[in-house]
């Protein structure tokens, strides 16, 4: 993020179950804070239809209130689907809100 911190958030889901969310927040000094699902949330906002017909949540809101983080992500390019044995979407993202940020997103299981 533009303040020198780095945020990583993972959201694992299984059909019919509540997603498991966790993350880490690294400070400029190198301190790493583990974030539980009580401390960080990630919510899908916009579903995008790809040229192959797949529909994916490619815009998300990420909140970590205790750390004053509230971000909305946006993708740079939508058609980044990789049809491997385990197909997935991956690509660079930007985020704005409490900070300006840039990063990477990977989605599987869609």
For every predicted segment, state its role.
Residues 1-110:
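Structured soluble/peripheral alpha/beta segments that form catalytic or ligand/cofactor-binding pockets
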